[in-house]
Amino acid sequence: MQRRRFIGAIAGLAVSLPGTGLDLPAPTGRGAVDPQVIDHFIRLRDALVSADSLLGPGDLVRSASEQVGAIAELYERIELRSRGRLFEVGALFAEFSGWLADDLGDFGTGRAWSSKALEWAHSSGNPDIAAFVLMRMSQQAQFLGERAPAVALAQAAVRYEGQVAGSHVRAAVHQQAAHAAALDGQERAALDCMDRAQALADAAQPTDDPYVLGSYCTSSYVAVQRAAVFSTLGDHRRALDEYDHVMQQWPRSFHRERGLHLARRTVVAARAGLPEAALESGTEALKIARDTQSRRTVRELKTSVGLMLRWRALPSVDEFIRAVTSEGGSGGSAQR
């Protein structure tokens, strides 16, 4: 489907939702809102999540954040028996808005959305959503180099293990626990967590995750995170081998993520002292970053630029550095 047509289809779905044109009954107290409205919000979120990997965040962030506001307006109007489910959906949209903000490089806004998502997840009583949001907050702390909060939040997510039903969500939680252990230099613990995440991802069924929270946490995703963990542990050559293996089989539907992981491979190749390997993946990653407007990918590429300055006398390296530098923004490293 063409980009413009796809965005138009999403807009057509959004326009029939609360806050965007749907004629709802006047707020006469509890029970004033048809509970089926919740299903409509869920369908819209599913469409936005599907669009995210193909289109990037720029075309979606406004629609997602508008739906959070629309949902919040319904909390006082929805009947009591449906309120918990509405809080679930509000938490899902807030988490997704935070994810989009992160991808645009606005980490302050992303963290604010995650805090709101955690509040609503606790209000809903849904442990899958609460664990997932804590995992995401750990990622955000890791993005910003805040090791202690990243580790503590990952451990908080793991403490939900016995309550979480979704295997994909549990896999996502354990792979982030692996990153946390690697940040603390605990190689054995990190690899054990990654093995657990791999087993969960391999065995996961779609019915385990009705809200499609951790559906991205596939076997391929866990494998590419293993490469990132090796890099954090300082084993850059092994990390590069892992990246090369998994990227050969990367799903086409995760186009934006392909760019992100190629950018991370570029950083690893530079740290391993391999400028040609860094250029190979960096050039493709930059093209995808431009196509999908992913600031996270650009941030990773800017990290690689700092490592590649020693090879700037090579014309191809100099050209790459200039191209990445022209993208603006700041350096840094992010996960998901």
Predicted feature locations:
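Compositionally biased, long intrinsically disordered regions
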Residues: M1-P35
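Conserved binding/catalytic microenvironments
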Residues: G29-R336
